[in-house]
């Protein structure tokens, strides 16, 4: 949550025994601060489920050290509105691109799972 999160929503979660971390003052969570706070609590692994924007923001900030990407064989089109696994500004040159090391590919029914460890340039 951020400092702007509704107090009643935070209180409802805390009443259920959930620890709510404040990670920034703005409208969006400061992801670097969130990961730092989790590390301080000795939480070394998280399951990040979200859209391409969240995944892209985490990857762009180099906050991910392992990726598990699921692909369903459905082509829906839609241009920019179409959901993507990872969305962020990107790189000017191909040799700056993030690559994946120790790549593993699995198939679960019609879906494909790609697991790898990001290698960041520079």
Positions of the model-derived regions?
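Enzymes that bind and transform nitrogen-containing heteroaromatic metabolites
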Residues: 1-122
């Amino acid at each position: 949550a951020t400092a702007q999160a509704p107090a009643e929503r935070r209180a409802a979660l805390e009443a259920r025994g959930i620890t709510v971390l404040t990670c920034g003052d703005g409208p969006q969570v400061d992801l670097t601060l969130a990961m730092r706070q989790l590390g301080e609590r000795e939480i070394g692994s998280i399951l990040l489920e979200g859209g391409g924007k969240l995944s892209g923001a985490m990857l762009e900030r180099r906050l991910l050290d392992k990726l598990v990407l699921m692909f369903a064989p459905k082509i829906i089109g839609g241009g920019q509105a179409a959901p993507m696994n990872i969305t962020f500004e990107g790189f000017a040159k191909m040799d700056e691109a993030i690559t994946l090391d120790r790549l593993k590919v699995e198939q679960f029914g019609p879906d494909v799972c790609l697991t790898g460890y990001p290698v960041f340039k520079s």
